[in-house]
Amino acid sequence: MASVGIIGATGYVGTEIVRLLQNHPDINITSVVSHNFAGQKISDIYPNLKNVFEMECDELDIDKIADKAEVFVTALPHGISKEVIPKLVEKGKRIVDHSGDFRYKSVEVYEKWYNATHGMPHLLKLSAYGLPELHREEIKNAQIIGNPGCYPTCSILALAPLVKNRLVDTKNIIIDAASGVSGAGRKTDLPYQFCECDENFKAYSVSNHRHTSEIEQELSLLAEEEITVSFTPHLVPMKRGMLATIYANLNCEKSTSELIELYKEYYKNEYFVRILDEGKLPETKFVAGSNFIDIGLVVDKRLNRVVILSAIDNLGKGAAGQAVQVLNILFGLPEHRGLTNPGFYL
């Protein structure tokens, strides 16, 4: 059995990784690490794990935990990883990191959008961007994998076939995306309290959300030219799920059916990418609890514009599910191993 340690196991992303891996046929969780809950059973913190997975949480001490696992998943806040990842690298461990620290090719871009100094620029050469559908070979050979953000995953995969085939105006792409509240993590900040979120729908970080730069980086690599996007995130009063509505002006005449066939061909070997037939559009209830992304589109002939819609679970394909997909790659397993569960629907 392959062995994995989860550092930051008691946050929403961490515990979702536990939920997915505890029943994985080929990967064994050998350490769960939580600074705040060290010495307590994780099932005491999350009672849904009672009688299923009751491992005691380790303290965050790399010297003590390093030998427990071959690969470590770090689910820590941005910037905090610099206290952990270099030590794991020194001990020869591979890491799947959920912070933004290893998602960027450029230190300058990271520091501009995160308004922080990158604490580990010397390690970027060891890293790969963890979106398997676009960077599978790089992931196989990397020591550190920067797990993508949820909004970028939902947006990049929705746009990739159009951008790669140079079918849209690359200077006028608009992305409106809405996320469930779990995307903010397990914290007590006022904007995420029940009375602030319930029966409320709001935009935030308009024109300056840090995921803008992540989306632009990956689309620019695909297009082999600089791409800029207008990205606006929204908060939806639901626990999990994400829906992106993307507008792009076509630079040639294409029908809805032609573009759907293009998408199906582009993603024909990608198990987790589901391209919907003409007349059908994604909904969050179809993907919540799964690692799938559903993509649908409509061409507005009047404006010669394509509207692409994509849906993921922000905790699934947007975080924990994608991390398990990456772990499968690192261990030489089929990517769908342990991830074939459908969405909850209800």
UniProtKB/Swiss-Prot annotation:
Top EC class of this enzyme: oxidoreductase
Residue intervals passing through the bilayer: none
One Gene Ontology biological process: L-arginine biosynthetic process
InterPro entries: AGPR_AS, AGPR_type-1, NAD(P)-bd_dom_sf, NAGSA_dehydrogenase, Semialdehyde_DH_NAD-bd
A Pfam family matched in the record: Semialdhyde_dh
Gene3D superfamilies: Dihydrodipicolinate Reductase, domain 2, NAD(P)-binding Rossmann-like Domain
Enzyme Commission number(s) from the entry: 1.2.1.38
HAMAP family in the record: ArgC_type1 (MF_00150)
Entry-linked CDD domains: AGPR_1_C, AGPR_1_N
Predominant location category: cytoplasm
Subcellular location: Cytoplasm
Active-site residue numbers: 150
Family: Belongs to the NAGSA dehydrogenase family. Type 1 subfamily.
GO molecular function, one term: NAD binding
Pathway: Amino-acid biosynthesis; L-arginine biosynthesis; N(2)-acetyl-L-ornithine from L-glutamate: step 3/4
Name by which UniProt lists this protein: N-acetyl-gamma-glutamyl-phosphate reductase
Role played: Catalyzes the NADPH-dependent reduction of N-acetyl-5-glutamyl phosphate to yield N-acetyl-L-glutamate 5-semialdehyde.
Keyword annotations from UniProtKB, A to Z: Amino-acid biosynthesis, Arginine biosynthesis, Cytoplasm, NADP, Oxidoreductase
One GO term describing the cellular component: cytoplasm
Catalyzed reaction equations: N-acetyl-L-glutamate 5-semialdehyde + phosphate + NADP(+) = N-acetyl-L-glutamyl 5-phosphate + NADPH + H(+)
Source species of the chain: Acetivibrio thermocellus (strain ATCC 27405 / DSM 1237 / JCM 9322 / NBRC 103400 / NCIMB 10682 / NRRL B-4536 / VPI 7372) (Clostridium thermocellum)
